[in-house]
Amino acid sequence: MGESTRIVYDGFPELTGGTMCGHGSIGTASMLVETGMVPVSEPYTDVVLDAPSGVIRTKVRVENGRAAEVSILNVPSFLYKRDLEITTEKWGTIKYDISFGGSFFAIVNAEQIGLSLERENVDEITKLGMEIRRVVNETVDIKHPYLDITTVDLVEFYAHTDNPLADMK
């Protein structure tokens, strides 16, 4: 499985892009249950996946032989570096942290620079995220303690919301 999501169930083709993602893990577990490629039992079927970052354990709730929902227990996550800064021409100094949860993430509070995380700003958010990722990977020494993972793959922005349905999880 990989990013963008694709599931290979036979052979060893060359896989480009990222090699792991949470939604790919959920999709793979669902596919394995629904195609009968794993022994299926109701109400739950456990599926274990081996990914480049480690073992991912999934629990598939099965109804009438179909995957109804999937929960995952991902690889151990941790805070790698805290309170780092980069400077951009447009946004000035931006503080961020680097965390790990299957891959490395740069975590940015968008409120510090006045960037509203609204749909109308998606192009600006994307552009800034790509710039942050590039600069971080060019300037910060990143090395997983025991896996061969040495780059930030994703930038995640967060901000407060007044939407009562958003729980920040």
Annotate the PLM regions.
Residues 1-20, 25-169:
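Active-site proximal loop and beta-alpha junction motif in alpha/beta enzyme cores
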